[in-house]
From Swiss-Prot:
It is found in: Cell inner membrane. This is Divalent metal cation transporter MntH. H(+)-stimulated, divalent metal cation uptake system. Involved in manganese and iron uptake. Can also transport cadmium, cobalt, zinc and to a lesser extent nickel and copper. Involved in response to reactive oxygen. It comes from Escherichia coli (strain K12). It is a multi-pass membrane protein. Residues 1-19, 72-95, 146-155, 221-238, 298-327, 371-387 are cytoplasmic. GO terms for cellular component: plasma membrane. The lineage of its organism: Bacteria, Pseudomonadati, Pseudomonadota, Gammaproteobacteria, Enterobacterales.
Length: 412
């Protein structure tokens, strides 16, 4: 009986520690459901029904491995990816890395900020500029939580992630997808046309987010409690749960678009405004409102994460720190310029995804090199199978992004 009590007590202690260490992956997972993903998944579902759902499944599995590697680097070395690059690469290379990482973080933030502004515009009936002002105010308020430490921010962003997931459960109920066809689309690969191949590449290419790779390693570098192996074990659970939720949201986005648009003849729906306006008569005003609210939640949380990532790359690469409110103010400016110039927000969103593709290999390659170095990682070094899988993902993602880039440049 005494032994049972001891085992039960130690089991509870282990679960309590695991729960205490969870949270960083929920911040990272927000990067996988930003407005760029909304646009890509809606277009894919409207154009090809359930046929590209399998791409979301595989993209999410790849992203899980990459986020585990990023988190593991922080746990094993006590330094984030940007700091490791600073310590191991020549100074000109480090400065190049910092500049490209800042540009990519700002380009990503542009898409996320405008996405949230579009959401406010749709649900409140305000102008896009007024939506941008509301987005700016809301992100400032969320970022103020950082003063109280990482945990309050993790809870708010985790709550927004769960809200988006709940919103898409509601959307699935409204749209009533064919479950047999949905299951088939998730399991059986299908690329019926060259446009489907291009969209599949877009789904995969927009999934791996370089700024989140830098950020996740910084969120885990200061974790305390238990041994390194225990922290790593808790982190794997953290990543598995958070990324499964993000994967579900992406699947639900595409499935809802397929059920609502593709099978009702609206195969040309390609932007967020059009999706909202088309949902109203097809499903209901409530379904359209839920879509708008989920877009606001995803946009706000992902733009906050983008601001945090920008802070990490600046501190990591060049040891320079500016207050978060200054960074937030500066990174908002491109969004307001785009809106005031009257540029097409959806086109800007797509262009930002293309720019983001430049940074993927630059983040993935050093991540794999560092996590495969036994001197750096100790007992958490990558296994041979993880190394091989990692390099396959690098080659695949880089090749697809180059292809997307060329295709976009040629207007394919």
């Amino acid at each position: 009986m005494t032994n049972y009590r001891v085992e039960s007590s130690s089991g509870r202690a282990a679960r309590k520690m695991r729960l205490a260490l969870m949270g960083p992956a929920f911040i990272a997972a927000i990067g996988y459901i930003d407005p760029g993903n909304f646009a890509t998944n809606i277009q894919a579902g409207a154009s090809f029904g359930y046929q590209l759902l399998w791409v979301v499944v595989w993209a999410n599995l790849m992203a899980m491995l990459i986020q585990i590697l990023s988190a593991k680097l922080g746990i094993a070395t006590g330094k984030n990816l940007a700091e490791q690059i600073r310590d191991h690469y020549p100074r000109p290379v480090v400065w190049f890395y910092w500049v490209q990482a800042e540009i990519i973080a700002m380009a990503t933030d542009l898409a996320e900020f405008i996405g949230a502004a579009i959401g406010f515009k749709l649900i409140l009936g305000v102008s896009l500029l007024q939506g941008a002002v509301l987005t700016g105010i809301a992100t400032f308020l969320i970022l103020m939580l950082q003063r109280r430490g990482q945990k309050p921010l993790e809870k708010v962003i985790g709550g927004l992630l769960l809200f988006v997931a709940a919103a898409y459960i509601v959307e699935l109920i409204f749209s009533q997808p064919n479950l047999a066809q949905l299951g088939k689309g998730m399991v059986i690969p299908s690329l019926p046309t060259s446009e489907a191949v291009f969209l599949a590449a877009g789904v995969l290419g927009a999934t791996i987010m370089p700024h989140v790779i830098y950020l996740h390693s910084s969120l885990t570098q200061h974790l305390h409690g238990g041994s390194r192996q225990q922290r790593y074990s808790a982190t794997k659970w953290d990543v598995a749960i958070a990324m499964t939720i993000a994967g579900f949201v992406n699947l639900a986005m595409m499935a809802t678009a397929a059920a609502a648009f593709h099978f009702s003849g609206h195969t040309g729906v390609a932007d967020l405004d059009e999706a909202y306006l088309t949902l109203q008569p097809l499903l209901s005003h409530a379904a359209a409102t839920v879509f708008g609210l989920s877009l606001v939640a995803a946009g706000l949380s992902s733009t906050v994460v983008g601001t945090l990532a920008g802070q990490v790359v600046m501190q990591g690469f060049i040891r320079f720190h500016i207050p978060l409110w200054v960074r937030r103010t500066v990174t908002m400016l491109p969004s307001f310029i785009v809106i005031l110039m009257g540029l097409d927000p959806t086109r800007i969103l797509v262009m930002s995804q293309v720019l983001l593709s430049f940074g993927i290999a630059l983040a993935l390659v050093p991540l794999l090199i560092f996590t495969s170095d036994s001197k750096l990682m100790g007992d958490l070094v990558n296994s041979k199978r993880v190394k091989q899988t990692g390099w396959v993902i690098v080659v695949l993602v880089v090749a697809l992004n180059i292809w997307l880039l060329v295709g976009t440049a040629l207007g394919l």
